[in-house]
Amino acid sequence: MKKNMNNRMVAKRKELLFCILMVLLPTIQFILFYIVTNVNSFFLAFKRHEYGMFEWDGIGRFVEVFNDLFKETINSNMVKEAMKNSFIVYFVGLVASLVFTLLFAYYIHKNYFGGKVFKVLLFLPNILSMLTLCFLFKFFVNRAVPEVFMDLFRKDIGIPMIDGAPTEYGLLMFAFIFFGLGTQLILYLGAMSGISDSIIEASELDGVSSIQQLWYIVIPMIFPTIKTFLVCGLAGIFTNQFNLMNFYGLGRDNDVTIGYYFYKLTTEGKANYPYIAAFGLMISAVLIPVTLIINKLLEKVEKEFV
């Protein structure tokens, strides 16, 4: 009896040690790369950079950000344009990726014709780095597409399609949406695979069409996954750089987003760090309550919808 108790104690200690080791590395990473980094950013927001040093400045950087957002300053046009573009990229990307990913995931889940081909094509961008993908995409639309038009239609497009052409913004948006489909596709497919076959078979026996099955059965049952994407996506509104860095480096002045604008500021020197930190805190002060409210609303929708 005593021996069995000792064995249980040893087993529990080993299990506890295993759990500690499993969470140790992620915990250290969270402390170093989130807490420490953000604590430093918090204090930077109340400082200014002069003569190679950071000095206490109170709310000076916050006033500067407020003026750039709501008044006419040297940087106000760029900041307002970046804010507008960030919202456009977020909402267009959200709607397009949600609709297309759900439809493609459902198509593949139903094992319709060519489903496996779509699965490979949509997940392929996740295998390569984003920089490589952008380089290949830019080469394709600037070089390959004009040559195809010339061979097939004897029509010279004239200018590169993604470098100053009227098609540039549309192609950037297409690339942004397409490159982001793979991860969502896999997660939606995983959620759909958890739906009981008996439910699907019962709906088919009742004469439910594929569209009705998607709307009334599949979407409600994978709604927690959809909700996760919707809530987490809010955090990326002002960090998304729209792949502009990968396509143009630091030389882009049009269609910039807040994420790209921040990155350009960091490369210009430490003097911009307090401004970026203050801007980030103001964004967080708005996004945190908005995210919590939307999460609560989606939870209510989930209870009624599911």
Annotate each language-model stretch with its function.
Residues 10-306:
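A structural signal for multi-pass alpha-helical bundles of membrane permease subunits
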